[in-house]
Design a protein with these regions (language model features):
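The canonical Cys-X-X-Cys-His
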Residues: 97-101, 190
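PAS/PAS-like sensory domain loop/N-cap motif
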Residues: 72-74, 97, 197
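Short pre-active-site segment immediately N-terminal to redox-active cysteine/selenocysteine motifs
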Residues: 85-88, 93-96, 127, 186
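Thiol/disulfide oxidoreductase modules built on the thioredoxin-like
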Residues: 160-167, 171-224
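A short beta-strand-turn-helix
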Residues: 55-88, 112
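Structural microenvironment flanking redox-active thiols in thiol-disulfide oxidoreductases
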Residues: 86, 101-161, 174-181
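N-terminal targeting signals for export/organelle localization
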Residues: 1-67
Length: 227
């Protein structure tokens, strides 16, 4: 018996079929990507305002050696919103971060204005990127503005940091454990806490996408007032 030949598609029909198939595949892939974006977790930007700040214990440098520091030991747990207890300004930095280098001057200015009403605490992390290889000697020099070459991505002597020496605790977070517990992945970051440790202001919530643009000086004025 003679073998039947498959009927050939008219010229151009096979190209049309391939085009339709490619378009269908592209449409399915686009739909998958869109669903993935919708279902993907929202990037972490730090603790939500109104929640208790994540506590931590680490070594702190205050100008005279390193000693244990627990954030919650400094809270006023009886704060009722009307007492004169101090608020907290929590700053995360990396001594090799160029933005943190520049922010040193603003922090000096803010501390001179608010230091009697706000406890400043700087947490020195070490980001896992090139030329970010800090150590305690560098952290001390960054805080005190003393000579140590290696700050600002190994480009500058720490004595040249903008601003004045910082007269408040610097916390060692070389392992980034505190940074991660706060839901952060980069620096600089700042937050204002109420005297009982409740997060009152989160920089990323206000200055990130969809935020109202309120900056740190404005937030201090609104929340703490009196200046």
């Amino acid at each position: 018996m003679a073998r039947r030949r498959a009927k050939a598609l008219p010229k151009g029909k096979d190209e049309d079929v391939r085009t339709v198939a490619m378009l269908a595949t592209a449409g399915i892939m686009s739909l998958v990507v869109a669903i993935s974006v919708i279902l993907a977790p929202i990037p972490q930007v730090g603790p939500d305002e109104g929640n208790q700040a994540p506590d931590f214990v680490s070594e702190a440098y205050s100008g005279f050696g390193w000693s244990e520091y627990r954030l919650s030991d400094n809270y006023d747990w009886d704060w009722n919103g009307s007492s004169d207890s101090n608020w907290f300004l929590i700053q995360f930095i990396d001594t090799d971060c160029p933005y943190c280098w520049i922010e040193g001057e603003e922090m000096s200015q803010l501390h001179s204005q608010w230091g009697d009403k706000v406890n400043f605490v700087t947490i020195a992390a070490q980001l896992n990127i090139p030329n970010h290889d800090s150590n305690r000697d560098e952290v001390e020099a960054f805080r005190d503005k003393t000579s140590y070459f290696g700050c600002n991505s190994d480009r500058d002597d720490c004595i040249d940091r903008p601003g004045t020496p910082h007269d408040w605790p610097y916390i060692d977070d070389g392992t980034n454990s505190i940074l991660e517990s706060w839901g952060l992945s980069g620096t600089p970051f700042t937050a204002i806490l109420e005297p009982d440790g409740t997060v009152a202001w989160n920089k990323n919530k206000h200055q990130g996408e969809g935020g109202d643009g309120e900056d740190l000086p404005e937030a201090l004025q609104r929340l703490v007032g009196g200046q």
